[in-house]
């Protein structure tokens, strides 16, 4: 179930403040954030936000299509190392 429309989308207040300051100044800097739950709002379009994935900050360039999604959706927290190679399991004998 989604968030109440009465409350509006969640955006970290500090992140929104930084975005508004950059928009007023007309600058495009990379902004580091740990707030993966923040919703992407139209004010963020055109900015690059470095979203923390638990290991490092992943730079995410915000486009029009991303509005309404959360920042954490674009910074994956799990790495897929790949499946085991078939040749490695062929030589083993089951007991």
Curated annotation (Swiss-Prot):
Keywords: Ribonucleoprotein, Ribosomal protein, RNA-binding, rRNA-binding. One of its GO terms (cellular component) is cytoplasm. InterPro entries: Ribosomal_uS19, Ribosomal_uS19_bac-type, Ribosomal_uS19_SF. It comes from the Bacteria. PANTHER family: RIBOSOMAL PROTEIN S19P FAMILY MEMBER, SMALL RIBOSOMAL SUBUNIT PROTEIN US19M. Protein S19 forms a complex with S13 that binds strongly to the 16S ribosomal RNA. This is Small ribosomal subunit protein uS19. It comes from Thermosipho melanesiensis (strain DSM 12029 / CIP 104789 / BI429). The lineage of its organism: Bacteria, Thermotogati, Thermotogota, Thermotogae, Thermotogales.
């Amino acid at each position: 179930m989604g968030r109440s429309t009465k409350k509006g989308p969640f955006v970290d207040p500090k992140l929104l403040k930084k975005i508004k300051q950059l928009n007023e100044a007309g600058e495009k800097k990379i902004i580091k954030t740990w707030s993966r739950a923040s919703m992407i709002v139209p004010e963020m379009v055109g900015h690059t936000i470095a979203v923390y994935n638990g290991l490092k900050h992943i730079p995410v360039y915000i486009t029009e299509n991303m509005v309404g999604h959360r920042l954490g959706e674009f910074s994956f927290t799990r790495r897929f190392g790949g499946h085991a190679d078939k040749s490695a399991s062929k030589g083993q004998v089951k007991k």
